Every structure is written in structure tokens, then in C-alpha cells.
From Swiss-Prot:
Name of the protein in its database record: Alpha-conotoxin Mr1.1
Effect recorded for H53 to A/R/W: Decrease in inhibitory activity towards human alpha-9-alpha-10 nAChR
GO CC annotation terms, alphabetical: extracellular region; host cell postsynaptic membrane
Biotechnology (record note): The S52Dap (S4Dap) analog has potential as a candidate for drug development candidate to treat neuropathic pain. It is also much more selective for human alpha-9-alpha-10 than the native peptide (a9a10 (IC(50)=4.0 nM) > a3a2 (IC(50)=20.6 nM) > a7 (IC(50)=259.1 nM)). In addition, in a rat neuropathic pain model, it shows potent analgesic activity, superior to that of the native peptide.
Species annotation: Conus marmoreus (Marble cone)
Effect of S52T: Decrease in inhibitory activity towards human alpha-9-alpha-10 nAChR
TM region positions: none
Domain of life assignment: Eukaryota
Family of the protein in this entry: Belongs to the conotoxin A superfamily.
Amino acid sequence: MGMRMMFTVFLLVVLATTVVSFTSDRASDGRKAAAKDKASDLVALTVKGCCSHPACSVNNPDICG
């Protein structure tokens, strides 16, 4: 294999590695966003549950308004 061919193969490997790394990183960002949405939904349900109980709503007027 010539020097030029080896350099071309090297560049192709670097490009392929970069593309795979970039796409997998973006996929993990999506999973993180989905987990964050689930957590905020859970917090909202917990607050709503607290506000429906008189004792809890009295102790947390800043949340239940």
C-alpha cells in the first residue's frame, strides 16, 4: 500500500469515528431531555397531590398558592 493510500484510509477512519461519535452524542442528548421531562412531570404530580391535601397545602403556601 502506498503512502497516499494509507493517508486516505486514515482520513476515512477519522471521519467515520467523528460521525459515529457525533450521532451517538446527539442521541444521548435526546435521552437526557426525555428523562428531564419525566422528572418535571413527576414533580408536578407530586405538587398537585400535596395541594389537594389541606394539611400539606397549609404547610406549603408558596407552592399551592
